[in-house]
């Protein structure tokens, strides 16, 4: 069959531009006489086929298809557009006026709402409504170029819903849609992929002779080449590609995507005759068999649940003893909270099935015997875990270790999938199990077993949810000609109905119950939660479940026929799946609107409130007999908080007692555990980290502005070095230190307080209350004592629960190879995505972690290991040789600590960081047993810490020689102690003051120590306030002064002297700090020239919109996110809630912008230094980890890392970064203006008054500042015009702003002529930032020879 010919027809039509209303997604038409009518010229359109077309098959002719092949010339331009994140869409806040930014974000909000509704309708098979939504999306002007992706989503769903729809009719439908409904939209390669997939499914009974011409025709129509069609693996399955290559032979291996080509080349799939191609029904059967647990129909009952082979049913108990992951280690006595039970359930994803054990036993190595020395069978009852770390270390050769790691990586892929995607069914099954057991015993006392209660709630809530879903489906399936006749409930159902029908009702019940229980004591209200937080949390949890299911379902479909089990082939499949997942997660840009989340959450919570009851008992006041009854478990009401009326959900005290008031459980999520395989590398801003959960490079909270800049930088390739550094952090493999864990678990299970671990305490013991007629001072003292005890009890319980989490996770990962994926905060600082257990945690967390890979100590490694122990004991300001001597003088203590950590002298507990010291003692003790210590294989991370790293950056920025010396940038024989130096300066100041008779100085002068000032010196550089510093110092003085008020008074006095001493020592640093603060203040109070009247209140009071933005040396754009919040009102079943609107363009918070810039700028520099160092260490083959300004590697690699740290710091500061920042600010905020004050009596003021009077006459009204900005904007446009005539006109224009252009020192002008509020008048001044402070003489290159820069 020949390719259809093209005729060129140019049609001109009058189209009325239809816009999206700012109030929502309703479409409105301009009036007929509106100027919005525009002319559109269409490109060539296919109207027929070549007369020479053949009819090869005798059935299919070229006249039958493909008629939709129109506008071919411009088709390429359309396919490069991908769906964007909500915050990316048409929003550049610094290239548009305030009004256009608001309009753009309004349209973005509308598009996002339409997108999410389109997706929901398609998933619910509401095809007619989906098509009407497509028509609305088509009418958004800015969205036209990306509209084909929306249409493709619709077309794909249409194909799936009716796989038997004839291909020729499918072709006619596509042609009609693109020619009639969406005239100026071009198909792309994904459209062709959908048609090919449909053709393969429809022609399941057609011979290859009939099918081949159809496929060939579509392939010839490719826009960007055939490979682009086959890259759509979310449409074309491996089976499809196998048929096209091996059966129809219409493609060659070279035309396949790189990710799947090795699979199809190395695998001959089970021959699939063309007349037996699996249709959609068959696909559904396969999916039901393989993933029944995750991909059930939405009306499936709980009894139909099947457990995937990778995830044996593990029951999560919410009362009593919870099943714990089997490990060859002592079980931990858990804090009895629902949070702890949830996390234990999650960790069961690490357990091994008999099939997996059998798979491990078949690992092949060069060793004679199987390394596991086990022959598990499917009936094996031995549940002891396998210690992969011990296996790895037992292998004698490097080759065997590499082979083991390769096999382990393939093996762990499936385990990682289970770990990230543990569903809700296990919880539901456990509730059912406990209920039936209690029923069998005749014991339904819900006070004894919370699970029984939860199962009753679940069973009573499930019919209500199903009934609501049926109502929604019924309403959505009706043809509603007039929505005005609907009541309010049904009108709301039309909005949230398509979303509510997406998830299995049983799952929604479980998620609702778990979310509310997890929100207990974390919802912002004592014994309850804020309603707004509750409804949003439940709605978002439902959405996340849907997203997770979609990724798994797509992967299951694409790879459904791949079942070959050789390790080599599995590796190819895992690689292909990884690429596929990345693609799918990147494409998942649709977010449900907050209003939909709120409504879904409120519907489900209101149903739970209706059925959730708790048993209560009381005493009859007459008979004094005990009586029993039921009370609601949750109650909705209102309370006042800080003067505001809040809607709250209160939890009954009976339920509170069972939940034990746990505080941290809300954040326990299976996706947030360490990983068993290497994280997905960061290659763009929205793809990296976990494999099945989307993460973004920056942790942002509803800040489209940040994301817009980040996306632009990523697309331009500006932040590749940031990705390089993050990927090195993520690729570092870890494991749990078994010896430290055994000691911690012994301490934990005793329940006694030990070091920073508080003891177990079930009840709060309060002192007896004094008589009511006691002296007020006695009552006040008692209340303060009670408050202190209550706060400590709450804090200790919180800390104990947090420790419990860490230990449970550590226990589950014993013997495992684990990784920590990282991303960044908005300043560029790196943090692990797994929050509960990582190397950024407390001392215990760090002591529990060691590197998976070991390295020989070598000549210098032993020295650095000894230095490391000395540092952990707080002797980090001694010369290196003295630190080594400290360790060598305590060899017997080290031996005793390692061999008798709890029964010996416990010397290790006297360290500043005891758990890390114990880990180092264990390692050093093993080293001392060896004949040649240099041969010892070390796994212990050794740290190199900066000396008040923020001050190091400030000293380098300001060229401050004295400051640089105090923070070890200058070479010296011994390390400088900046904290001790500041303490000496403060003491000298107090001694002078005491001599002059200052009583406070007399009392304090002998009490100033390094410890008193350390925290304040450390945080001063990061912008600590006077009040904050006062409390820091008060904490250090509290052991000296018993009276709290006295301690606070002395602290206020002392803080002034500490601040003055720091400023004296780091003079240049403080000048830079002042310059940063002043620059931020001016920027946040500035106005763009293209701002319009809508951004002014009464014409003279503008909303200040300018965030402070800068670019780090690594190209990462930093946007300070401090803006005023705007709230949106949403009516729900429970109450009207106010939710944040992420698409609103709000004024900046000028105070926070100013206060934030100095610390944030320094943070962005230390983050840049870390990422540069990480990338370079990765290139040199080092295992590298970082805790902000503390860098870790193997002892033997410390010397190499130290060279890298110094070279990268020099590389960073060889450029004058303050001057670079000033130049960036000048360019970024060029032509901005600010409001200033002038005395009316000055000559300049009189000139401005005359100009304003002249403008007023022309305008026929009073002139506003908005008018003055408008005319200055016109002047700038004329000056920048390419036409000389325009430029001449611009040069002759005089505006109120142009009068100040020749005045060089505007600051002096304002200072001299400003006047007060009454005598001054407001004027517009050009924004000019202050000149940067002069730079000192310090040469940063000298730190190459400073051995104490990091040590």
Curated annotation (Swiss-Prot):
Entry's Gene Ontology molecular function annotations: DNA-directed RNA polymerase activity; mitochondrial promoter sequence-specific DNA binding
Q: What is its EC number?
A: 2.7.7.6
Native organism: Saccharomyces cerevisiae (strain ATCC 204508 / S288c) (Baker's yeast)
Which InterPro entries does this entry report, sorted A to Z? DNA-dir_RNA_pol_helix_hairp_sf, DNA-dir_Rpol_C_phage-type, DNA-dir_Rpol_phage-type, DNA/RNA_pol_sf, RNA_POL_N_sf, RPOL_N
> What is the catalytic activity of this protein?
RNA(n) + a ribonucleoside 5'-triphosphate = RNA(n+1) + diphosphate
Please give the name of this protein.
DNA-directed RNA polymerase, mitochondrial
Membership in a protein family = Belongs to the phage and mitochondrial RNA polymerase family.
In Pfam terms, one family for this protein is: RPOL_N
Source organism, top-level taxon? Eukaryota
